[in-house]
Every structure is written in structure tokens, then in C-alpha cells.
Curated annotation (Swiss-Prot):
It comes from Pisum sativum. The N-terminus of the protein extends into the stroma where it is involved with adhesion of granal membranes and post-translational modifications; both are believed to mediate the distribution of excitation energy between photosystems I and II. The light-harvesting complex (LHC) functions as a light receptor, it captures and delivers excitation energy to photosystems with which it is closely associated. May channel protons produced in the catalytic Mn center of water oxidation into the thylakoid lumen. Its main location: plastid. The keyword Transcription does not apply. Binds at least 14 chlorophylls (8 Chl-a and 6 Chl-b) and carotenoids such as lutein and neoxanthin. This is Chlorophyll a-b binding protein 3c, chloroplastic.
Length: 22
């Protein structure tokens, strides 16, 4: 994902989706 892996988690995190990109 690269850059998207940093943007999507932020957008989806507010949507109730958890990501492990921390």
C-alpha cells in the first residue's frame, strides 16, 4: 500500500476500522 497504507488507516480509523500500521 505504501503511502495509501498511511492515509487509509487514518480515514477508516474514524470509520470504526482498526489497522496495524501504527
Amino acid at each position: 500500500l505504501g503511502a495509501l497504507g498511511c492515509v487509509f488507516p487514518e480515514l477508516l480509523s474514524g470509520n470504526g476500522v482498526k489497522f496495524g500500521y501504527a
